[in-house]
Amino acid sequence: MKKISIYLIATGIISLSSITAHSQSKFEKILKKVTTKTGSTSTTKGSSTATGTPTTSEMGFGIKEALEIGISRGTDLLSAKDGFLGNAAVKILFPPEAQKVERTLRSIGMGSLADNVILSLNRAAEDAAKEAKPIFVSAIKQMTITDVTNILLGQQDAATNYFKRVTTSQLMEKFQPVITTSLNKVGAAKYWGDAAGQYNKIPLVKPVSTDLSSYVAQKAIDGMFIQVAQEELKIRGSLGARSTPLLQKVFGYADQKK
């Protein structure tokens, strides 16, 4: 009888140990699942903060990155063949005071001469546009935190206005000699001289004398800023133009503030 009792007690202990081990194993599995789930939740929360408020440093890098992308794209477009000539928004035509020259030439069957003048003006601007990128990049590097904040949270053309303020005089200084050389290279001075000469021969007309170099330089600069403004609008308004996570974060923040 005593032996039977000992046997039953031993069997009970073994069974209890088995149950306890099984329960512990099951508990560990549940704990593991909870821990994993909690970890993934934390990770998700952590990643969501990446789309929150950017730091001052991130805003600076983001704006500069966006503008460098836009400036590079814009200057490459305008400096290519037909960059000015093939773009109605920036195409350079006869100076306002000389448009009567163009009309007269076309009316007397000399339209090809007028076309040559327009072609040469735009080729000169395309040559000059190659000089613009370093000037714009330098202006981007000089931006202060105040400039960056004003651009990020400012009007749709805030960056374009910044460039106008900072780079116009440098662009004119750089463009004018390039355009003068280019006008001579493409024969613009000759075409213009021929066109103005033919017009000035017409009785009773007021002779025209336009400084082509200054005119084309100013129109080329105007065209640069038109293109820059278009690139700025793309970055601000098109999610596809925000090509990096940093740009998405910075401009996403700007969207929320407006």
Model-derived regions: residue spans:
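Bacterial N-terminal signal peptides
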Residues: 9-17
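N-terminal Sec/ER secretory leader and immediately downstream segment
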Residues: 26-118
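An amphipathic alpha-helical core segment
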Residues: 178-223
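Mid-length scaffold segments of soluble, non-membrane domains
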Residues: 110-182
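Sec/Tat signal peptide C-region and signal peptidase I cleavage site
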Residues: 19-23
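Bacterial N-terminal signal peptides that target proteins for export
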Residues: 1-8
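A cross-kingdom marker for long, charged
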Residues: 26-39, 213, 220-258
